[in-house]
Each structure stands twice: as structure tokens, then as C-alpha cells.
From Swiss-Prot:
Keywords: ATP-binding, Cell cycle, Cell division, Cell shape, Cell wall biogenesis/degradation, Cytoplasm, Ligase, Nucleotide-binding, Peptidoglycan synthesis. ATP binds at residues 125-131. It is an enzyme of class 6 (ligase). This is UDP-N-acetylmuramoylalanine--D-glutamate ligase. One of its GO terms (cellular component) is cytoplasm. Its EC number is 6.3.2.9. It is found in: Cytoplasm. GO terms for biological process: cell division; cell wall organization; peptidoglycan biosynthetic process; regulation of cell shape.
Length: 493
């Protein structure tokens, strides 16, 4: 059954103001939805199985939507609710429109419920979303624009609309879950950074996953990472118009290969790599605009530069000057667990990329680094690791593998790189396992090496989330033990 429930902005606001709305989920996203509904003056009921934070539990809500007398006029779901959950299926069967938090906030904003509509920027992809979102927000702010990060990081989108200090630019990190429930969401500009098999149990197929991601490109200025074959083909096959290209290649060479109105890429020179914009003028000549040095970007390596290039391509739509972009980029500090350098001692750098929860993310995390001691393992969720090992193996000094699916990684390492030193950590205590892993990595590492936590797997086999896993890695790397390993759960989207 289709999940699309198309509403126009004004009709959505009219429903909220005059009829009953159900909000599925009372977590962070749900609270943001509630804040927005209260700002509009809506009548709503929160659905959650935690009685202390809800008006209805799931069973009660299913009964309500199944009756014409008690069914809501609209159901707004938090992104964690699966399309095949009984409540959402019951709502759709009853003809109740189902939308997500991004869709609801965008509709309310476009209707003018909170003043002049804002500018929306959507950033999605299998990996790199958070860093690219934070970079984009920092660049806009450096250019003097009132911008805030919303969605998976920063402020829930609904809460951003009712904030005391208005933001004119909403930079939304949007997961495939959120886009799934956003049938009419049309950002002013958006980017798909990359695509790899992920969350297929949620979306049902790679086609479903990719189709949901494509919704970020429906605006008038879509940005496409043309180095990524799946992204490039997705945009081409679906006829996405007016594509702005971002690439790690020389932008003039990209422009020569295909027609784009504008390309942002990387130009190598004797002074180092420079992020550069190239466009074709009306007279056919190339207009070349150097934007910022690509040297010393955080996080280090190609993945960090790729995120910076995408962010530059997005903000140039709003005439942010290169000097402001450069200032923001070189003052930027990566968020925790996303390639953050957490310790440096005896010539060895320790890097926490606990957010690399799938093989594609691990490849990005390790790319560009040499002499790596790799700390890996956790829940693979059925992901294949053959290509991952083939890609990263040549750069490894050694590996330390822990977690419930460690045997598969160890087996593949032995098959492809039989001489590589590999330490297995069988301890299943969260703190004990990480303490052993860090101790083993310290033994393997030599001056000039990088010890990188890039698990290629989810963390919930042992940890409360990827944040706790990364915190413990950093704490033991610094020699402070488990005292920092107390972060609350953080989801892995």
C-alpha cells in the first residue's frame, strides 16, 4: 500500500486547527511535533506505550483509527515508526493521511503559520549527513544568515518553527525514514551525498530506499554527488532537472564530461587542493571561483573533503561569499563519533568514528589514511564485508575485532590478508571489551599510525548506542578508563 498522503500546506494547517491529530511517538521528534501543534493551536493526542508521556497507547490508537467516530483527521509519525507498524497500516486502511515530522513542519511553514516561509535545505545520504549538515549551517551563519540545523541533529523541525529566535534557513539532516513520510516536501535545495544498502529491512528494497532518498532532490536547485555512481544514476534515471554537481574531481573536467549549470569540485595546485566552483557563462567561457582550501579540513581524509564540497555547493545558492565559507570551514570541528581525533600520544593518533555503523561508512572513515590499526565489529545486520575488507585491507597495520558478528570480519581478513595481525576480543562486557580492544590496538600501533574506531557495524549488541561505544574508546585511549562512557542512547540512522 502506498504511504503517500498528499496534503497542500493550507489544508494541513486547517486540519490541525479544526480537527484531531494523532502524534505517533513521544520521543525527541514527537516532542518537536507537539511544540509545533501547540503553536498552531491544534487539538492532538500523543500515542506511545509509555503511559506517563502519552494520551493513548498503541492498542488504543489502533482501535480509535479503525472507527469512523474516533479516527483522527491526520496522523503525524516520528521517523522511527516502520511503515508496516500496525498503527500506521490501520490508519492508512481507514483513509487517515499519514505524514512525518519533516513533512508536517514544512507544510505548516509553507502555509505561513509561523510567518514568512523559511528557506529549507535538505541533506541526506547513507553516510556523511551530520557533518555536511553542520558544515552547511556554519557556512550560512558565517555569511550573516540566520541558520539552524534541524532534523536528525540540532533542533526538531517543528520546534525550530516556534523557537524564540527565528531562523530563516533550516538546514535539515533528513534520514530515509523521514523522507519516506514526506510525499510533498520540496526543499529549496538539497543533496544526496551517497547511497549504499542500508535499512533495507525498514524500506523493503534498495529501490524503496533510493526512492525515498530521491525526495531530497525535488527542489529547484538539486545538488548531486556525481562521483557516486548510484546517486548519479538515480538522478539521471528520474530526470532530475537543473542539477548542480559536486565532485572530488577537477570541476572543469566534470563540466567537460557532462552539462551542468555549475560544478563544485577540487583543483590540485602546488599550493595544495582548493575547493573551486566552475560555471559556464553565457558567452561560453568558464567562470572559475576559488572558494576555500581543502587542506586541514576536519574530519581528515577524503570523506571530510567530500562533505565540505557538498556544503559549498549548497550554500553558494544563497550567495555566501568564499571568504565566509573558508572562515567557517577552517574553524569547523567535527561532531563527536564522526571522525573526531580524540587522542594523540607517542606519534599515534586515535580517531573515533563510531558512527560508521555499516561497511560503506567504514570505507569512507578509513579512506585516505595509511598505517591504520582498525578497531571493528558489532552487529553487521546481514551486511557483507568482502568488499569492505578488499578496499581497506591494504592500508591496515593490524585489526582488533569485537562484537557479536566479529567472526565474519575475522574470517574475511584471514582469507584476504592472511599475514595481517588480528586480535579477537571475545569479552562481551561493554567496558571490558573496549578496554581490551584499546590495549590490543596500542600494542599493534607504531609512531605515525592511526588507531581508528570504524566498526562497520551497529553497536546495540553490547552498547546503549554508538555514542557510548565511541566515548569508551576515547576514554580508554586517553587512559581515563570508563568514566566518559556514560552517554545516553543515540540512534543509528
Amino acid at each position: 500500500m502506498s504511504t503517500d498522503s498528499i496534503l497542500n500546506p493550507q489544508s494541513a494547517v486547517d486540519i490541525i486547527r479544526s480537527r484531531t491529530v494523532f502524534v505517533a511517538g513521544a520521543g525527541v521528534a514527537g516532542k518537536g511535533i507537539v511544540a509545533m501543534l501547540e503553536g498552531i493551536g491544534g487539538n492532538f493526542k500523543v500515542v506511545d506505550d509509555r503511559a506517563q508521556v502519552a494520551d493513548l497507547n498503541t492498542a488504543e490508537a489502533i482501535a480509535a483509527v479503525s472507527s469512523a467516530e474516533t479516527a483522527p483527521a491526520l496522523l503525524i509519525t516520528s521517523p522511527g515508526w516502520r511503515p508496516d507498524s500496525e498503527l500506521l497500516l490501520a490508519a492508512q486502511a481507514a483513509g487517515v493521511p499519514v505524514i512525518g515530522d519533516i513533512e508536517a513542519a514544512w507544510l505548516a511553514d509553507q502555509a505561513g503559520a509561523f510567518g514568512t516561509p523559511r528557506t529549507w535545505i535538505a541533506i541526506t545520504g547513507t553516510n556523511g549527513k551530520t557533518t555536511a549538515t553542520a558544515m552547511t549551517t556554519a557556512m550560512l551563519q558565517a555569511g550573516g544568515l540566520a541558520a539552524v540545523s534541524v532534523g536528525n541533529i540540532g533542533t526538531p523541525p517543528g520546534a525550530a518553527l516556534v523557537a524564540d529566535e527565528r531562523a530563516d534557513y533550516l538546514v535539515a539532516e533528513v534520514s530515509s525514514f523521514q523522507l519516506h513520510w514526506a510525499p510533498s516536501f520540496t526543499p529549496d535545495t538539497g543533496v544526496v551525498l551517497n547511497l549504499a544498502e542500508d535499512h533495507l529491512d525498514w524500506h523493503g528494497s534498495m529501490a524503496g530506499y533510493a526512492g525515498d532518498k530521491l525526495r531530497a532532490l525535488r527542489g529547484p536547485r538539486p545538488v548531486v554527488a556525481v562521483d557516486e555512481q548510484l546517486v548519479r544514476e538515480l538522478a539521471a534515471d528520474n530526470g532530475v532537472p537543473n542539477v548542480v554537481a559536486c565532485s572530488m574531481q577537477d570541476p572543469a573536467e566534470v563540466l567537460a564530461q557532462a552539462h551542468f549549470p555549475l560544478v563544485v569540485g577540487v583543483v590540485e595546485s602546488e599550493a595544495g587542493a582548493v575547493i573551486t566552483e566552475v560555471a559556464t557563462a553565457e558567452n561560453g567561457e568558464l567562470q572559475v571561483t576559488p572558494i576555500a582550501s581543502a587542506e586541514a579540513i576536519s574530519p581528515p581524509g577524503p570523506a571530510g573533503i567530500a562533505d565540505a564540497v557538498a556544503a559549498c555547493a549548497l550554500v553558494r545558492a544563497f550567495d555566501v561569499p568564499p571568504v565566509a565559507i573558508s572562515q567557517a570551514l577552517h574553524g569547523f570541528e567535527v561532531q563527536a563519533h564522526r571522525g573526531q581525533a580524540v587522542h594523540l600520544a607517542e606519534g599515534v593518533i586515535w580517531i573515533d568514528n563510531s558512527k560508521a555503523t555499516n561497511p560503506h561508512a567504514a570505507i569512507a572513515a578509513l579512506g585516505g589514511l595509511e598505517n591504520i590499526v582498525w578497531v571493528a565489529g558489532g552487529q553487521l545486520k546481514g551486511a557483507e564485508v568482502h568488499d569492505l575488507i578488499a578496499t581497506v585491507g591494504p592500508g591496515l597495520r593490524g585489526a582488533v575485532v569485537l562484537g557479536c558478528d566479529r567472526a565474519e570480519i575475522i574470517r574475511e581478513l584471514a582469507a584476504q590478508f592472511p599475514d595481517l595481525p588480528v586480535t579477537e576480543v571475545s569479552n562481551t562486557d561493554p567496558e571490558g571489551a573496549m578496554a581490551e580492544a584499546v590495549a590490543a590496538a596500542r600494542t599493534l600501533a607504531a609512531p605515525g599510525d592511526s588507531v581508528v574506531l570504524a566498526p562497520a557495524a551497529a553497536s546495540l549488541d553490547m552498547y546503549t548506542g554508538m555514542a557510548q561505544r565511541g566515548d569508551l574508546f576515547a576514554a580508554y585511549a586517553r587512559g581515563t578508563g570508563a568514566e566518559a562512557g556514560t552517554s545516553e542512547w543515540e540512534g543509528e540512522s
